[in-house]
Amino acid sequence: MPRRLLLLLALLLLPLAARAQSWPDRPIRLIIPFGAGGISDSVGRIGAEWLSKQLGVPVVADNRPGGNGAIGMEAVLRSPADGYTLLGASASHLVVLPLMQRLTFDPQRDFTPISMTAGNPLVLAVATGMGPTTLPAFRDMVAARPGQLQYASGGTGGLSHLGMEVLLQRLGLQMEHVPYRSGPLAMQDMMGGRIQVHLGNALDMTAARDAGMIRLLAVTGATRSAILPDVPTVAEQGWPGFEVTTWNGLAGPAGLPVAIRDRIAGAMRQACADDGVRRSLLRIGADPLCSTPAEMAASMQRLTPIMREAIALSGATVN
């Protein structure tokens, strides 16, 4: 390449480098594509508070619900890739949504992964009176009654529904799906004896487990949950490699300067070493993760074929 052209490129890149070095010098907006309340909103706000302290500028949580998350995501994509507008998203938005809904953007192409902040473990629960105390025992019981037993989910096409379909396929089982409007509503009916099996968030289940009303058989992540360390994984109980994971994390628009991306990710890694942040996350039922950008990107790529298979198994339609 001619020396003059190299010099011109260097001059053009100088303003970008200068902006990255001076960042941040004004408030940062964290768009959360959920309504206020709930675990995903809480994880986003915990992250925003920590980043405010670490970066020395306000990080303002901005709830933008609607379109199953697409409205908030589009708002981030319309913003400059300068680190002043970030997305507090989940695996549902960045992985499942593009498989379920026709979008004007591709999350894996149009966003920069920064950090998986916290995991939201899915847990298989059965009513205490049902009998099984392990996943193999559950498999044997359901296999003896194909298609006769029901399981509840927090809604058709949601992660509790899709995750259960993948689990049933791996176990070689058939059950009837009973969708609810939310996980807590499914848990209410489970505690009332109207449903006996549910795959849902750990936070929705701990009180019922502690009261002896349900039994937790397995978590679907690759490792045990810090929230429920006594509950074994599916893989531990005879199905190696099984993993259905959901998490909340931070992303920016494509083209976010690497220096800014890495500074945010570094701040979040420090968050998971902070006892106060860890306690705050565990209190709301979230496992502290605080991953690197590469780990978040790898998780998105790994989950995509799993969720594509789950959607096909579930019969859910693409809108």
Locations of regions flagged by a protein language model:
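N-terminal (or domain-start) structured segment
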Residues: A20-D110, Q148, T156, G172-L199, ...
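A ligand-binding cleft/hinge motif common to bilobed small-molecule-binding domains
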Residues: S92-R102, L168-R170, V197-V231
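Hinge/capping helix and adjacent helix->loop/strand transition within the periplasmic-binding protein
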Residues: R78-Y84, L99-L185, V234, W247-S280
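N-terminal signal peptide c-region/cleavage motif recognized by signal peptidases
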Residues: P15-A17
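An extracytoplasmic/periplasmic, membrane-proximal ligand-sensing/linker region
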Residues: D25-P27, Q169-L173, V258-N319
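N-terminal export leaders
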Residues: M1-L12
